[in-house]
Every structure is written in C-alpha cells, then in structure tokens.
UniProtKB/Swiss-Prot annotation:
Family stated for the protein in its record: Belongs to the paraoxonase family.
Gene: PON2
PANTHER family: PARAOXONASE (PTHR11799), SERUM PARAOXONASE_ARYLESTERASE 2 (PTHR11799:SF17)
Major localisation: membrane
Cofactor(s) in the UniProt record: Ca(2+)
Cofactor: record remark: Binds 2 calcium ions per subunit.
Protein name: Serum paraoxonase/arylesterase 2
Function field: Capable of hydrolyzing lactones and a number of aromatic carboxylic acid esters. Has antioxidant activity. Is not associated with high density lipoprotein. Prevents LDL lipid peroxidation, reverses the oxidation of mildly oxidized LDL, and inhibits the ability of MM-LDL to induce monocyte chemotaxis.
Length: 354
C-alpha cells in the first residue's frame, strides 16, 4: 500500500512538472517563427556589437543607449567587457554612436546597465537614470548629463529592499521614478523557480527620497515601463504574459489598472512617441531562442507600433520583423523625427529612416 501511495504521489508530481514545463514553453512562444517585415532604409550601427538593451531619446534628438548587458542565462558576445552608455545625435546628417565618459569614483569595471530613462528638470538639467546590475546585484544609478563635455556625472546610487530584481525604470522627477521588478526574489535559483511555477509575484515600485512603495503587483514578469506624454498613465509590459498594462497615475503616485492589451509576442521595452502618444515596442517572437542560444537558429526580432491604446480597439502594426539574420533579440524601438532605432539584448542595433 505504501509503495502504491509513493508511486501515485510521484506520478502526480511528474504530471505537475510536465504541465508547468508545457505552460512555460507556451509563455515563451517556443514554437513561434516570425515572417520578415523589412524597412528599406536601415543599417547596423557601428560600435554596438554586444547589445543595446534600452534606448531613450531627448526632445533635442540626443539618444542614449545602454550597452553590454550581462544577465544570468543570457548569451553575451562580450562577456569580459564592462557595459556603458552611448549617445547618438539624431539631428546629424550621418549620426554615429559615441561612448559617454562617466565621472571618477564610479565603478566602471562592474557597470552592467539595463533599463534607462531620462528626466528634464525645470532648469533644463538632464538626469539619466540607469538600472545597474553590478555583480548581478540591483541598483539604480542617477547621473547628470553634461552635454558640453559629453559626459555623465554620477550623483547617487539607489538600493532598496523593494527593488530586488529591477528591470526597467521611468523617471518622474530628479530623484523620483517608477521601476519594474521582473521577479519577487533576487536569488537566481528562486527567480527560476518563480518563473517556472508562474507565481505572478512581479510588481511595480514607486521610489522617491521620502517614500518607497509597491504601487502595482500581480505580474508574471514586469518588464518595460514608460509614461504617457500627458503624465496621466503608466504603461507596463508583462513580457511572459504577452500583455501591456495601462495604469492611471494618481496625485499620491499610486496606480490603478485601467485595461490590458493582449498581444501574440513577448513584449520587452516600451518607448513613447511624444508627438502622437504611440507606443513602440521591442519584442521577442520566440523567447526560448533567447535563453538557448544557437548561432544557426538565432533569436528573431519584432517591432510593434500601438496607436490609440486607450481606445476600445487600439491599432497594432508590425513595423519590422527579422528572423535573426540581421538583428537578434530586439528589446527596444524608439522613434524621433522619422528615424527609428532598434536595440537588442545582446546583439547589434539598427538605425532606420521611416
């Protein structure tokens, strides 16, 4: 009798494990292949060889790139090279990427930038917020951009127990931001277990020098985050749920969910066209290829444009898609004055004229 019980329990456990594995494959879109959608005027950006995970563009056309992300479980084309911040002036006739100098005293050797966001203060001071994973830990670095010197002055490192697994950030003040935690845990094994069991413990945190609080939760894996041009709404990408959440921002900085847009791809970073309010999304058609890297079958890329997200039927357009032959693992797409920049987790970056 005891053996029958043991065999029965083992069978139940194996069935549950199998069901979770199948569910994870579905969340990763492991069987999906993408059909190419080409743009006619594109070229790879020289100097970006090992990823440009996030991009943010100032109103004057200066674009910031976070490059060189290393992440447990992800491939890297430059595993021994520290990350950095590059800048490109999109108003130039032939824009090129230049690395920004960072002030002395900042630990460049362990710099591992992830999501980024800019904020322009009332006195026109530009702040750059960078999610950083030094030695795979979690901090938010706040810099002052000094345009005349093409440099970043490090102002502050933010660490907090409510920021255990930071992915992306959107700045709403000189030392104020919303950030996504893609996991509840910081330990790599517990992160994997959390993902495997589909616990939906990821969240969004509001940070200010005087208050830190969870303002939205229940996400599978909260990823990209951004704010509408009128500052009324926060958009959050839930990458493994294939969703974009629209949340209303209140005066106390709390968030209330208004709607969820379901998509058929893994949504990564979100960029906003300030002139139209359109959301541009860097997507992963097949997430399994990201984590099990095969140079003969590389991860594909996909860029979506979402118009009128607050309406009953938003318009979703595939602007660009590639099977990995040109661009692998697109994570962000940002537009400025008819120009499109597409960044990746660990591959190249693309410049296109629309």
């Amino acid at each position: 009798m005891g053996r029958l019980v043991a065999v029965g329990l083992l069978g139940i456990a194996l069935a549950l494990l199998g069901e979770r594995l199948l569910a994870l494959r579905n969340r990763l879109k492991a069987s999906r292949e993408v059909e190419s959608v080409d743009l006619p005027h594109c070229h790879l950006i020289k100097g970006i060889e090992a990823g440009s995970e996030d991009i943010d563009i100032l109103p004057n056309g200066l674009a910031f790139f976070s490059v060189g992300l290393k992440f447990p479980g992800l491939h890297s084309f430059a595993p021994d090279k520290p990350g950095g911040i590059l800048m490109m002036d999109l108003k130039e006739e032939k824009p090129r990427a230049r690395e920004l100098r960072i002030s002395r005293g900042f630990d460049l050797a362990s710099f591992n930038p992830h999501g980024i966001s800019t904020f322009i203060d009332n006195d026109d001071t530009v702040y750059l917020f960078v999610v950083n994973h030094p030695e795979f830990k979690n901090t938010v670095e706040i810099f002052k951009f000094e345009e005349a010197e093409n440099s970043l002055l490090h102002l502050k490192t933010v660490k907090h127990e409510l920021l255990p697994s930071v992915n992306d950030i959107t700045a709403v003040g000189p030392a104020h931001f919303y950030a996504t935690n893609d996991h509840y845990f910081s330990d790599p094994f517990l992160k994997y277990l959390e993902t495997y069991l589909n616990l939906h413990w990821a969240n969004v945190v509001y940070y200010s020098p005087n208050e830190v609080k969870v303002v939205a939760e229940g996400f599978d894996s909260a990823n990209g985050i951004n704010i509408s041009p009128d500052d009324k709404y926060i958009y959050v990408a839930d990458i493994l749920a294939h969703e974009i959440h629209v949340l209303e921002k209140h005066t106390n900085m709390n968030l209330t969910q208004l709607k969820v847009l379901e998509l058929d791809t893994l949504v990564d970073n979100l960029s906003i066209d300030p002139s139209s309010g359109d959301i541009w999304v860097g997507c992963h058609p097949n997430g399994q290829k990201l984590f099990v890297y095969d140079p003969n079958n590389p991860p594909s890329s996909e860029v979506l444009r979402i118009q009128n997200i607050l309406s009953e039927k938003p318009t979703v357009t595939t602007v660009y898609a590639n099977n990995g032959s040109v661009l692998q693992g697109s994570s962000v797409a940002s537009v400025y004055d008819g120009k499109l920049l597409i960044g990746t987790l660990y591959h190249r970056a693309l410049y296109c004229e629309l």
